[in-house]
């Protein structure tokens, strides 16, 4: 069955990605290995600095720079998947992604701000910059959910 083979490949990619790039503490996917995300102390100092030595307001290269964008995209995809499969596993994955997006939007206490990501170490440190792609995908994923 072609669908079964495709599902198996998708599940392998999910599990492999989750093992390296996902933190169950924050329910977010990172763009670096979770173990390589800067410490809360480095985040507070806006490190790593940009290549030109300037302050890194958005956390570029930190692994936290696109968590909300990725989370929204993943959540929307999980909602599509749930519409077809109606399975408990997809429902649980979607709920986890929703929790991560809500964390990024609330952990800092700044109403209306969506952080790009949250430290997987202390589950609260963030970089102060965001962008429209973080908002767009995060809100779209939450809307689909």
List each language-model region with its residue ranges.
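Low-complexity, Ser/Thr/Pro/Gly-enriched N-terminal "stalk/linker" regions
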Residues: 1-66, 96, 100-117
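Well-ordered alpha-helical scaffold segments within catalytic/enzyme domains
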Residues: 1, 72-87, 137-145
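Soluble or luminal CAZymes and related metallo-dependent hydrolases
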Residues: 9, 93, 130, 134-137
